[in-house]
Amino acid sequence: MLGARAMSAVAVLTGDYHLSKRYTQLLLKDFFNLPASVGTISNAEEIVSEALKAPVEEAKEHIKKQPCVNADETGHKQQGKKMWMWLAATVFVAVFIIRGSRASSVAKELLGEFFNGTLTTDRYSGYTWVDIAYRQFCWAHLIRDFIKISERSGEAGRIGDQQ
């Protein structure tokens, strides 16, 4: 049985760094002279996952009740399949979920069906179910869009070049 720190290390190595159980086993042995079987590593993953269930659910519920939330989503491939990493963040809490969809149903899962705070996002249509009076567009996204417009040819570019 591994101690709390070793189990935490296993969780980071296999979860965050995506090391296989075999590589995690080798790393523990080579760096810490800590022998651990693949089964021990699997058990540590299970124990850490179970220990994190309640805090993760608490964080998800916290997000849904906040007066101001920033949200975004970004696509990536996971084992060759298109996936989306969704983020909802407040000053103190950030929640990430990975789903195979960019649909508004995932935004509702993350923020709650009846989110009633102020939501800062890009202009992605998956958030249009939130009343526009409670949506704020992300300044960084707007600046990037303005720069792209200013780099166009024609009238838009001419106006964009003015100071």
Regions inferred by a protein language model and the residue ranges of each:
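Catalytic center-proximal scaffold of phosphoryl-transfer enzymes
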Residues: 1-163
